[in-house]
Amino acid sequence: MQLSPQEKDKLLIFTASLVAERRKARGLKLNYPEAVAYISAAILEGARDGRTVAELMNYGATLLSRDEVMEGVPEMLPEVQVEATFPDGTKLVTVHEPIR
């Protein structure tokens, strides 16, 4: 299978988000990479579903709360930026303060 660097990145994000989802489901608090992967994958899937950039910016800030991540993670993550493919092309989605 021949994958572009962008496709490899998306596959890595998806794989890391699966680990994060399973840990979250078991009641474990997510660390920094898991939180980033969890939010990023949700944004990528939302773009694939046809949601708008504005919708995803708002949605991304509702995915995780401070209680679901390890101490210090919200402060380490002032924003998440994801380059997502929409029906009309690739756009950068920025979620400010994604963990509230």
From Swiss-Prot:
Catalytic activity: urea + 2 H2O + H(+) = hydrogencarbonate + 2 NH4(+)
Domain of life where this protein originates: Bacteria
GO cellular component: cytoplasm
Coiled-coil intervals: none
Entry EC number(s): 3.5.1.5
Pathway entry: Nitrogen metabolism; urea degradation; CO(2) and NH(3) from urea (urease route): step 1/1
Known partners and oligomeric status: Heterotrimer of UreA (gamma), UreB (beta) and UreC (alpha) subunits. Three heterotrimers associate to form the active enzyme.
Family: Belongs to the urease gamma subunit family.
Alphabetical list of PANTHER family matching this protein: UREASE
Entry protein name: Urease subunit gamma
Organism of derivation: Synechocystis sp. (strain ATCC 27184 / PCC 6803 / Kazusa)
Gene name of the encoded protein: ureA
